[in-house]
């Protein structure tokens, strides 16, 4: 149970941001930190904490959280309870930059107020939040002013986003971590890019560039400067919550490719590595060396995992085999219980049902250390 000082700190941070304070449940989540051996996470009292949960990136109809959290708040509450009942202790939410910034230097106070209510919901439900920011998942919803910014101005706006979000959440133990951006990438050395968003997947732009051109700089230096800029914005108002970046493990695609943001020389201000792993049938064993290569003296969270290119059985075998290298696992939940997927006997629905059933069945095994 979080101590009285932590309860007061969370209330003060919220009140200072100008938002109403909601009472916290007695069983609300406590603070999480990196363990002393730098391989995993622990509670304040030293008990091991294994992040085990879901990406709550969209609902069953493909709508993003901000599309329905105002008119359908009861749905969000129900989904959080269902994720908890399936065994989750962490929920990863994906905040869209266009919903939290009204302009380059103007946070949206209504969105911040709703975020604080979501943190309170997590507290009441007994869940931690991984708050991933700067999303531009629906290309049509990205503000024209944001798309038009040059690199320096875009980074400044991103810093405004993170300072506002972190300011609302500072002092609240239910927040497990801040993830600066989902799958940031950089252009090639001699290949300036024409747009900030990479190709879509399933109608969504999950991958985003942090620069359109290196202009003679090293990719490593650009990545390092970006991490320092955004973590600096967070640390100006919040010195305690963990910070990470959701990284594509390029070694899964290109043999010998090395980590970028997981490299301590580049992602020095980050507290742990977060990678997205989708094992392929026949190549399951290939993921383990890549996973270990991302550790580099810090915990590695598998922040995205799903049987996209393998069976649920194969995925389960990989997850068990990765226990010595991974500090936690976050899959996906899209607003339906496992039995609801039986109503439509499509291959995709059967795969999702199998995943959710595996997740629930594996909960005791994967969260005990």
What is the role of each PLM region?
Residues 333-369:
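Aromatic- and carboxylate-lined catalytic core of secreted/periplasmic carbohydrate-active enzymes
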Residues 287-290, 305:
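Conserved alpha/beta catalytic core and glycan-binding cleft of carbohydrate-active enzymes
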């Amino acid at each position: 149970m979080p101590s009285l000082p932590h309860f007061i700190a969370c209330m003060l941070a919220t009140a200072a941001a100008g938002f109403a304070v909601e009472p916290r449940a007695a069983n609300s989540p406590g603070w999480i930190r990196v363990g002393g051996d730098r391989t995993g996470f622990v509670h304040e009292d030293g008990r091991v904490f294994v992040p085990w949960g879901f990406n709550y990136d969209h609902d069953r109809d493909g709508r993003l959280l901000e599309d329905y959290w105002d008119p359908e708040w009861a749905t969000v509450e129900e989904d959080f309870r269902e994720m908890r009942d399936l065994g989750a202790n962490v929920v990863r939410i994906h905040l869209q930059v266009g919903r939290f910034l009204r302009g380059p230097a103007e946070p949206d106070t209504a969105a911040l107020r709703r975020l604080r209510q979501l943190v309170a919901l997590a507290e009441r439900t007994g869940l931690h939040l991984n708050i991933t920011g700067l999303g531009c998942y629906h290309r049509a919803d990205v503000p024209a002013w944001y798309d038009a910014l040059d690199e320096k101005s875009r980074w400044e706006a991103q810093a405004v986003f993170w300072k506002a979000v972190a300011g609302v959440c500072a002092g609240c133990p239910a927040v497990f971590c801040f993830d600066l951006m989902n799958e940031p990438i950089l252009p090639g050395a001699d290949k300036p890019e024409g747009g900030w968003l990479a190709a879509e997947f399933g109608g969504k732009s999950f991958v985003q560039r942090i620069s359109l051109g290196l202009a003679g700089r090293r990719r490593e230096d650009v990545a390092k400067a970006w991490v320092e800029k955004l973590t600096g914005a967070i640390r100006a108002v919040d010195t305690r919550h963990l910070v990470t970046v959701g990284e594509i493990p390029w070694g899964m695609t290109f043999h010998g490719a090395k980590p970028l943001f997981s490299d301590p020389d580049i992602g020095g201000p980050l507290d742990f590595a977060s990678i997205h792993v989708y094992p392929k049938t026949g190549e399951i064993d290939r993921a383990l060396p890549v996973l270990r290569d991302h550790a580099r003296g810090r915990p590695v969270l598998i922040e995205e995992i799903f049987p996209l290119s393998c069976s649920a059985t194969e995925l389960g075998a990989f997850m068990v085999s990765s226990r010595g290298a991974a500090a936690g696992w976050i899959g996906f939940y899209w607003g339906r219980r496992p039995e609801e997927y039986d109503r439509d006997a499509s291959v995709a629905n059967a795969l999702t049902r199998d995943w959710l059933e595996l997740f629930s069945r594996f909960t005791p095994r994967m969260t005990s250390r």
